[in-house]
Amino acid sequence: MLSRKATAILLVVHAAAMLASQTEGFVPIFTYGEVQRMQEKERYKGQKKSLSVQQRSEEVGPVDPAEPREEKQEVIKLTAPVEIGMRMNSRQLEKYQATLEGLLRKALPSSRNAQ
């Protein structure tokens, strides 16, 4: 027979496992401090990038503010088929079924018209 302490521990572990399987919550990968450090690095990169662009524009010459600026618009063309997937349990499927059906109705006719 198991002792009362072992039984209590197993019961707590089982309850925690059941709760974890039922939740749809967000599990943070990074700590709050790590996220702040990453944001600071991104800001620093952005400042560094804007300074280098500013220096290049000064080398070329002053830009007339009345002159319209042409911005490059890039279009990414896929050379291979792309497949996007997601996993859902039955409870999530019941919850989001109507939304998914609507998205599929919009996506499938548009892909048939394109072919």
Swiss-Prot record:
Instruction: List the keywords (alphabetical).
Output: Cleavage on pair of basic residues, Hormone, Secreted, Signal
Is this entry keyworded Acyltransferase? Answer: no
Q: What GO CC annotations are associated with the protein?
A: extracellular region
Chief subcellular location: secreted
> Where in this protein does the record put region Disordered?
43-73
Q: Give start-end of the signal peptide.
A: 1-25
The source's domain of life comes to: Eukaryota
Subcellular location, in the record's words? Secreted
The cross-references to InterPro entries, in alphabetical order and at most eight, read: Motilin_assoc (IPR006737), Motilin_ghrelin (IPR006738), Promotilin (IPR015662)
Gene Ontology molecular function: hormone activity; motilin receptor binding
What the protein does comes down to: Plays an important role in the regulation of interdigestive gastrointestinal motility and indirectly causes rhythmic contraction of duodenal and colonic smooth muscle.
| UniProt record similarity statement | Belongs to the motilin family.
- For this entry, the protein name equals Promotilin
